[in-house]
Amino acid sequence: MLTDITLGQYYPGNSCIHRLDPRTKILAVLFYMVMVFLANSPLSYGILIGFIVLGAALAKLPAGLLLRSIKPLWIIILLTMVIHFVTDPGEALWHWKFITVTREGIVLGVKMSLRLVLLLLVSSLMTFTTSPIVLTDGIESLLRPFKKIGVPAHELAMMMTIALRFIPTLLEETDRIMKAQMSRGADFSSGNIMKRAKNMLPILIPLFISSFRRADELALAMEARCYRGGEGRTRMHELVYGKADALTGLVMLALFVLLAFLRWGIPA
């Protein structure tokens, strides 16, 4: 169901990945995303997949937890692959009426789908190992230099974190409403796509009402705790870079150099 979406959820732990500075993890994820688009060979993608597997092992995440983040989006991933199969020009491998599958389309379709999977996995790995509060502190710290040009660093960080954390909350609420409707005889699994979409309409109004209610409750809770933004705000634990963060930075740099070499080789 919709609760299978894991992006935005935090998995408590005390692994070396959990203990990394949030700024290190955020920068590492951004760096990894760049490398995903840099990869262009099976070996490159194998290295990136190995990095995710190693990260999940070091974070001591349960087997299959990361893979759950792919399940809700498998239709989008599959659709991306199929579209490339039949729309990209190249050497024809199979033809039926107006549909032509090309070799280049298959290669590009697999690449694009794999990129989507890797981007989703690395994002989920970060949110699994970083609590919302720590993630907010990390984003705020990275945005702090932009305060000189008027960028509200803390407010932006808080908005981004609340939005990210609200994803699983909203999905849980949707699942709860769907189960309540199903107990009253609603059917969301049968019929064609149009009928299923029409059957989802009764969910929208209670979902909107519930979302506004939760947002109002959050605002009241923040006011009750005298929340006044980032000005003068202190932290229980200050962010400090350690040896593990430096080692992570070196690993990411080495990985980038390796992928750049695999893509372009040694310049003459």
UniProtKB/Swiss-Prot annotation:
Subunit note: Forms a stable energy-coupling factor (ECF) transporter complex composed of 2 membrane-embedded substrate-binding proteins (S component), 2 ATP-binding proteins (A component) and 2 transmembrane proteins (T component). May be able to interact with more than 1 S component at a time.
One GO MF term: transmembrane transporter activity
Organism superkingdom: Bacteria
UniProt entry tagged with the keyword Membrane: yes
Segments crossing the lipid bilayer: 26-46, 47-67, 73-93, 116-136, 151-171, 246-266
Transmembrane among keywords: yes
UniProt keyword list: Cell membrane, Membrane, Transmembrane, Transmembrane helix, Transport
Coarse class of the protein's main subcellular location: membrane
Subcellular location field: Cell membrane
Membrane topology reported for the UniProt record: Multi-pass membrane protein
Name used for this protein in its record: Energy-coupling factor transporter transmembrane protein EcfT
HAMAP family assigned: EcfT
Function: Transmembrane (T) component of an energy-coupling factor (ECF) ABC-transporter complex. Unlike classic ABC transporters this ECF transporter provides the energy necessary to transport a number of different substrates.
Protein family: Belongs to the energy-coupling factor EcfT family.
Annotated Gene Ontology cellular component terms: plasma membrane
